[in-house]
């Protein structure tokens, strides 16, 4: 059983995200109010808290510094296949991509002058939001809520 430690959003792409107390996950959109919400395959990004903690041994960064929407703990994202599915309350996130390469104008690179966040070992996991029963409904996400991973199990069968 995994757990959400932080939810982070930003109104513009290419900027650091900031923690928020809660968010609304809209089906086929992602996090309402976040710049990456929309009709595409990378609506929500996950990053493991363990990867952030390892980076913090070198340099302190806040949650959201790597552009992640959800900071999660309790499962090894690197071992999950694409697609994998995460239940968060009534919402379902489908892992659509492992990793997102850091670009040359990356906000964390500008802040730290390093490319230490590159590579699969530090990848964000990109997801699309779904609702298992009522696709037009929205589900709230809150830090501390359990998020069980269901690797490879499609919830819409």
Predicted regions and their residues:
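Metal-cofactor-dependent catalytic cores
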Residues: 1-157
